[in-house]
Swiss-Prot record:
Naturally occurring in which organism (per UniProt): Escherichia coli O157:H7
Catalysed reactions listed for this entry: UDP-4-amino-4-deoxy-beta-L-arabinose + 2-oxoglutarate = UDP-beta-L-threo-pentopyranos-4-ulose + L-glutamate
Cofactor: pyridoxal 5'-phosphate
The name this protein goes by in its record: UDP-4-amino-4-deoxy-L-arabinose--oxoglutarate aminotransferase
Modified sites of kind N6-(pyridoxal phosphate)lysine: 182
One GO CC annotation: membrane
Amino acid sequence: MSEFLPFSRPAMGVEELAAVKEVLESGWITTGPKNHALEQAFCQLTGNQHAIAVSSATAGMHITLMALEIGKGDEVITPSLTWVSTLNMISLQGATPVMVDVDRDTLMVTPEAIESAITPRTKAIIPVHYAGAPADINAIRAIGERYGIAVIEDAAHAVGTYYKGRHIGAKGTAIFSFHAIKNITCAEGGLIVTDNENIARQLRMLKFHGLGVDAYDRQTWGRAPQAEVLTPGYKYNLTDINAAIALTQLAKLEHLNTRRREIAQQYQQALAALPFQPLSLPAWPHVHAWHLFIIRVDEQRCGISRDALMEALKERGIGTGLHFRAAHTQKYYRERFPSLSLPNTEWNSERICSLPLFPDMTTADADRVITALQQLAGQ
């Protein structure tokens, strides 16, 4: 059998090794100048005013909710079709996640679903830019402004995603991920951008023990001796080892995403003749980052279930992913919200399958996936 083709593989090279070597030889391996450079680079990429690097996007979500003073008695609107960490962070703050349905074919929340879920207790809205495509963020942000509700963009899939000519995170508050499967990675890491100076100040304190300064003060080359804890905080800072890798990856972003786009186009052309349904593209002007390529496997239409397809591909040496099992079907949330029904979310959660997609894939790799899908579709 051919070598196993994973669902994802990070695109690392000699440049990343050199970046890590430089940090190790510098003598400063934790939060330092590489973090500052990464934050500046993301301000330049997005056009936003402030950037705060953190140890993960989950950590970023946690302290963003804290900075917005979201807690007991508050409600936060979010899709159920998202990684469960968002729901977990809302719940750990003592707030209530209000899960709404998604569009059946883009798998993103709609402004209409969000607005219908607003109550006097709604404190925040968390739309997800899903799979590398942008949600209709102008319309969602307008709802937030109309009701006085904060919008936190889950941009974990959206490094390199553009909406109506502007990079995701150009204004407001957005959270990016550098997890191992993301479009740029440093193994683990995340970053928040915001145009709110007060939120930025709170985030910098909360990510590092509640201190009023960073781990690395860029003026005095070391933390000032008079630094004080201004509020209880966490240990969510990003090391310079990770930041250096992320910076190197960011310099390659256009190349990495171009290759993702080429593979996605190869899949799209082949799937036109197959019963497996890819996601629809958003109607608004955008640039897709192609973080994921997802098909829906409906047994009645395809002659095979999603789970059986994934197992059959595995037997052929091809890895797949599931993004995501609906959060409200997980045990904890199923028991907490037993009557919640989200038809589009549930239909997709039972059928979605993420195909291999990463920059180092070859055309032959994609052809191998396509051939397997053709065989499993009986063609």
